[in-house]
């Protein structure tokens, strides 16, 4: 005779945790830092956005693909323009206070430092590519983009300085 089948029982223990639980939120509503745009770093970010937009639109409105060097200038200008808009939104909405795990002063220093270095190289490439094209109908747009690229470089240099000061004060504490 066959033995009757016994009912098996298992104990299952589950634990649930959410990655979002690790983030401390101070409030559920969005904050807006109205004073940020009145600070020098805030004004520099706005200048970077406006001048960076001028750099890449002045080049994009021409036949820039005929001069390969402008591809580098376009990449740097558009890449850092998008990231700068992203950082402006983070600073205005005070998102950095909701995500304390991110070392924002270090991120800001690396971002502004890399933007300064790459924009400087792009501005030099832009200026050196304009000169041989003096007879081109695109000359004025390219010359203006070169001028604005150097202005954006100065803005990123200023923000790199302020980021360094903020980073240094955080590491000393």
Swiss-Prot record:
<keyword id="KW-0202">Cytokine</keyword>
<dbReference type="InterPro" id="IPR050578">
    <property type="entry name" value="MARVEL-CKLF_proteins"/>
</dbReference>
<feature type="transmembrane region" description="Helical">
    <location>
        <begin position="40"/>
        <end position="60"/>
    </location>
</feature>
<keyword id="KW-0145">Chemotaxis</keyword>
<feature type="transmembrane region" description="Helical">
    <location>
        <begin position="147"/>
        <end position="167"/>
    </location>
</feature>
<dbReference type="GO" id="GO:0016020">
    <property type="term" value="C:membrane"/>
</dbReference>
<dbReference type="InterPro" id="IPR013295">
    <property type="entry name" value="MAL"/>
</dbReference>
<comment type="similarity">
    <text>Belongs to the chemokine-like factor family.</text>
</comment>
<dbReference type="GO" id="GO:0042552">
    <property type="term" value="P:myelination"/>
</dbReference>
<keyword id="KW-0812">Transmembrane</keyword>
<dbReference type="GO" id="GO:0005125">
    <property type="term" value="F:cytokine activity"/>
</dbReference>
<dbReference type="Pfam" id="PF01284">
    <property type="entry name" value="MARVEL"/>
</dbReference>
<keyword id="KW-1133">Transmembrane helix</keyword>
<keyword id="KW-0472">Membrane</keyword>
<protein>
    <recommendedName>
        <fullName>CKLF-like MARVEL transmembrane domain-containing protein 8</fullName>
    </recommendedName>
</protein>
<feature type="transmembrane region" description="Helical">
    <location>
        <begin position="70"/>
        <end position="90"/>
    </location>
</feature>
<feature type="transmembrane region" description="Helical">
    <location>
        <begin position="105"/>
        <end position="125"/>
    </location>
</feature>
<dbReference type="GO" id="GO:0006935">
    <property type="term" value="P:chemotaxis"/>
</dbReference>
<feature type="domain" description="MARVEL">
    <location>
        <begin position="36"/>
        <end position="168"/>
    </location>
</feature>
<dbReference type="GO" id="GO:0019911">
    <property type="term" value="F:structural constituent of myelin sheath"/>
</dbReference>
<dbReference type="GO" id="GO:0005615">
    <property type="term" value="C:extracellular space"/>
</dbReference>
<dbReference type="InterPro" id="IPR008253">
    <property type="entry name" value="Marvel"/>
</dbReference>
